[in-house]
Structures are given as C-alpha cells and as structure tokens.
C-alpha cells in the first residue's frame, strides 16, 4: 500500500511540474537536500578517511547543484521540457526493462556489486529503452532515425552504471536502501540513482 501511495504521489508531482514550473522549484529543492543528506549518510557509514569523505561530499554537492540548476533552466523552454520528459521516460524504461527481463530470463550475474543484476536484465534494459524512446520521439516529432537507437543505448547504459555505482556504495555501507524518504521505495537515491547519471550524460550528448 505504501509503495502504491508513493507512486501515485510522485505521478501527481510529475504532472504539476509539467504544468507549473513553480512546483518544480520546491521538488528540486527537496530532491537536492534529501539526496545530499542520503549520500553523506552513505559515505559516513562506509567510513572512508576524512579526506576521501570530504572530496566525495564536495563533488556530489557540486554535481547535484549543477544537475538541479540546469534541469530547472531547461524546463523554462517547452522544447527542452519535452526533451527532458522523453529522457526521463527512457531512464524509467531502462529500470523496468532490466527488472522484467532479469526476472523472466535470469541467467548469469552481471557483477558481484549487485547480485540481482543479470546479463539478461542489462540487455532487456537496452531493448525496452529503445522501444520506449522510439515511440516517444515518434509521437512528438512524427519522425525516426538511427540516432534514437544511439541515444537509447547511451541512456540505458548510463542509467545502469549509475544504478551499479549506488549499489556499490550501499554494499560498502552494508545497507539495503539509501533512506526511507519514499515509503515502500526507500530513499530518493534508490529511485533516482540511474536518472542522475542517465539524464546528465544524455544532455551532454545532445
């Protein structure tokens, strides 16, 4: 029930963000602050030495600030808002594709960092991302090209790397979730780990 309630709440927030940019300011503020606190908590539990902990926290703070700032600035333009929306769909598709294909086909593990990740899941992630991005881009532009496949592959691979990175940190910190901010889902970073890297890499590519 908690997971369903959280999903509905996030859907409502997404719709508000699309229609009203004012809502985006508050969402990004909460997202930034909570994500930073979750990251710092992870680093603290891993018990790096003070220098590495400081560098890690500073780097992530700068990264989050740039991510949220650019996200907000681009959202002021309808064309970029559509692009961001499509990229977010791609990141979500990557996550869902990995989960579904991994559950159905199972097979060899992808890495020790995250035992639940399989090669089948990684391939499924790319396949579903290609399908979803192709449909979304065709819907908005009535046009398709091979570039869509390239963008989809970059999106999926980037999301999977982001996911694995935070899985590595959680494994080192010996925790299941980065937090409990989202009931039934864990912390914000548990839901947006892939998006943080996926959207950033895509925007650089575009």
Summary of predicted features, one role per range:
Residues 133-137, 171, 202, 206:
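Juxtamembrane/transmembrane-helix interface segments of polytopic membrane transporters
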Residues 191-206:
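Final/C-terminal transmembrane alpha-helix of multipass membrane proteins
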Residues 157-161, 191-192:
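Hydrophobic transmembrane alpha-helical segments of multi-pass transport and channel proteins
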Residues 117-124, 164, 176, 186-189:
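Gly/Ser/Thr-rich beta-alpha loop segments that engage phosphate groups in nucleotides
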Residues 97, 101-105, 161, 165, ...:
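Hydrophobic side-chain positions within alpha-helical transmembrane segments
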Residues 1-157:
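Membrane-embedded alpha-helical bundles of polytopic integral membrane proteins
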Residues 172-194:
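Interfacial loop-to-transmembrane junctions
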Residues 40, 162-177:
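Transmembrane alpha-helical segments of integral membrane proteins
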């Amino acid at each position: 029930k908690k997971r369903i309630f959280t999903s509905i709440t996030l859907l409502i927030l997404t719709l508000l963000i699309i229609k009203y940019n004012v809502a985006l300011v508050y969402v990004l503020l909460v997202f930034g602050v909570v994500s930073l606190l979750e990251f710092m908590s992870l680093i603290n539990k891993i018990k790096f030495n003070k220098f590495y902990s400081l560098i890690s926290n500073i780097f992530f703070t700068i990264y989050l600030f740039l991510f949220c700032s650019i996200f907000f600035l681009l959202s002021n333009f309808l064309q970029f808002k559509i692009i961001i929306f499509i990229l977010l769909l791609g990141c979500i598709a990557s996550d869902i594709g990995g989960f579904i294909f991994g559950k159905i086909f199972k097979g060899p593990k992808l890495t020790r960092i995250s035992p639940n990740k399989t090669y089948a899941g990684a391939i499924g992630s790319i396949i579903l991302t290609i399908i979803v991005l192709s449909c979304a881009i065709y819907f908005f532009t009535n046009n398709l090209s091979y570039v869509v496949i390239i963008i989809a592959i970059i999106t999926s691979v980037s999301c999977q790397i982001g996911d694995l990175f935070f899985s590595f940190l959680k494994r080192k910190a010996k925790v299941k979730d980065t937090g409990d901010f989202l009931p039934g889902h864990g912390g914000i970073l548990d839901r947006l780990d892939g998006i943080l890297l996926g959207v950033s890499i895509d925007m650089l590519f575009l």
